[in-house]
UniProtKB/Swiss-Prot annotation:
One of its GO terms (biological process) is pollen exine formation. Glycans are attached at residue 94. This is Non-specific lipid-transfer protein EPAD1. Keywords: Cell membrane, Disulfide bond, Glycoprotein, GPI-anchor, Lipid-binding, Lipoprotein, Membrane, Signal. The gene is EPAD1. Belongs to the plant LTP family. GO terms for cellular component: plasma membrane; side of membrane. Disulfide bonds join 40-62, 63-105, 78-119. Its main location: membrane.
Length: 228
């Protein structure tokens, strides 16, 4: 029983001694991170990198700011801040280029691809652009046909003229006196009609022609005899 109590006491003492040590270690790491973050100057480091660095060209002047941004500036977060500066964006350098240069310069932290992925972070979801629906075309209703207004009372059609009978006309004119011709009768000449001339017979006309020829011959003969 006494041994078990002693074991429990020793465990409690060891736990009590380990908690302050862990807390102290955490505090030291936090202080180091704060110091490293304070020592990271992304604008100055980005200016130096843009002046002296080019992709796949790890010169001595280029390696100094690149290695300092990772080893002395707080690790990958500082390098990501340097890569986000406008100087490097204009120069065409990104975090992948810087980590490649860091590995070529002999940096203390390996795994450039993993560090570059940490800089880039998860890709944002692609925004889906939805086009607005087309406007609904409203159909215009044709205007209703209005009935023509009724004609006024003054413009009513007059009744057709009535046809008068001849009997009514005769009644109005009155009876004609005796001996007078009717108004519409044609004038007929009074007296006997002249007799047509008698037609000439065909025999007399046929005799007159030879008689005239004979008379002409006799006259010519007499004239010739008188001359001799």
């Amino acid at each position: 029983m006494e041994r078990s109590h002693l074991a429990v006491l020793l465990g409690l003492l060891a736990f009590a001694a380990g908690v302050p040590a862990a807390a102290a270690a955490t505090a030291v790491e936090g202080a180091q991170a704060a110091t490293a973050e304070a020592s990271c100057e992304p604008s100055i480091l980005a200016t130096q990198v843009s002046l002296f660095c080019a992709p796949d060209m790890p010169t001595a002047q280029c390696c100094e700011p690149v290695v300092a941004s990772v080893d002395l500036g707080g690790g990958v977060p500082c390098l990501c801040r340097v890569a986000a500066e406008p100087q490097l964006i204009i120069s065409g350098l990104n975090a992948t280029h810087l980590l490649t240069l860091y590995a070529a310069c002999g940096g203390l932290r390996p795994g450039g691809a993993r560090l570059a992925a940490a800089c880039e972070g998860p890709a944002p979801p692609a925004s889906i652009v939805t086009a607005p629906p087309p406007p609904v075309a409203f159909r215009r209703k044709p205007p209703a046909r209005e009935a023509p207004p009724p004609p006024p009372a003054a413009e009513k059609l007059s009744p057709p003229p009535q046809q008068h009978d001849d009997s009514d006309h005769n009644k109005r004119v009155g009876p004609l006196p005796r001996g007078s011709p009717p108004p519409y009768a044609q004038s007929v000449p009074v007296g006997p009609a002249a007799a047509p001339p008698p037609p000439r017979s065909g025999a007399s006309s046929s005799l007159q022609a030879p008689l005239a020829a004979t008379t002409t011959i006799v006259a010519i003969t007499l004239i010739a005899a008188a001359q001799y």
